[in-house]
């Protein structure tokens, strides 16, 4: 869609009191700006007659044309904005530092490549992470991350308005904690604060990212863009380039070959057919994952009639008073997913009463209580052990001390939303980190903030 922005042209017509003509009669907008000639206000809104307002001031108001600007015409400014978005939390990475060494020339080069439609994404970097679950990640070069943020800034606002309220991944103000809170809200709503019986159906899509058909995804994205008038050539070009990129082409593998041992085929992009799978690690992949399943969200809410529904990426749930209605929904949802090349995970179909313990997004929810899952507490324990091994009993520098303090505070801030006091406090009390830090309880935090001891700074 063409955006309205102020682009100043020569004054529209004669400004000395005569008629002002808009010859093209094209319905452009107009803007009044100060002009140093002794003249009057001349206004023209698609007519041949000037609307004159005599003015005794030396500086009259001259009406100038304001024209719709295309994305190409604001591209350089948009690229600088995208760069600053992309570098958040990435200031110390090698690819970001390399890009910043010649920042202006790199952005201008990228600008010309995009204007001439000659931009080609760089090869991705592939590696395996094992953060509770083994995953294959494809990381893009920082240059491509800038383009991803550029595309995000252009289209995310449109798709955000189309998503259902209860989808939580990669949306502002709708992270994991919001997803947990909304699950509890829906349970209390259906059960009338646990005074009535209700059931929850939990489902999971098997190997979601690795089974997304890029051709189907592009059809969905382009259909929405055209429907709402987002037909700028640059925007359509970026859609093609980003979705059509083959992450496996000339990618660089990092790590040991043994890192891929035990990785299921459903989580490995190289085991998928050509044109299938999105790279985990790109910002655009998070956006596309929400777009791809938006039709599923609407199918469940509006066609199957489930008001109490929520989804985080490929993990979703439905709540209803009728157990039979939920059982019937399994086959209908499975059929819908088959039409877009997806399948339900056969081992992750769970239908049980809302009074049972419900695991979702690292939390275990039960009536009137919210606990952390074993996986979440184990991650905190592992992180604590890692920091202890780095600290040992030796003196640590200010930079490391600040990083450790920030990491612990982040975990404590998150765990403060759960009933995990005894476990967390025991781990902290027994930790050798207390030789470098002290815990100061604040009035608005369950565990307080970790602060440096004064004597540890000597």
Name each region found by the language model.
Residues 2-70:
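C-terminal, surface-exposed recognition/capping segments
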Residues 70-226, 230-235, 247-250, 457-458:
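Conserved two-metal-ion catalytic palm core of "right-hand" nucleic acid polymerases
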Residues 106, 186, 191-313, 318-332, ...:
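Conserved polymerase palm-domain catalytic core
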Residues 122-124, 310-314, 346-347:
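Short Gly/Ser/Thr- and Asp/Glu-enriched loop/turn motifs at secondary-structure junctions
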Residues 140, 145, 149, 259-275, ...:
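Right-hand nucleic-acid polymerase module
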Residues 170-178, 317-320, 351-355:
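Beta-rich nucleic-acid/ligand-interaction surfaces
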Residues 334-342:
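A common structural junction motif
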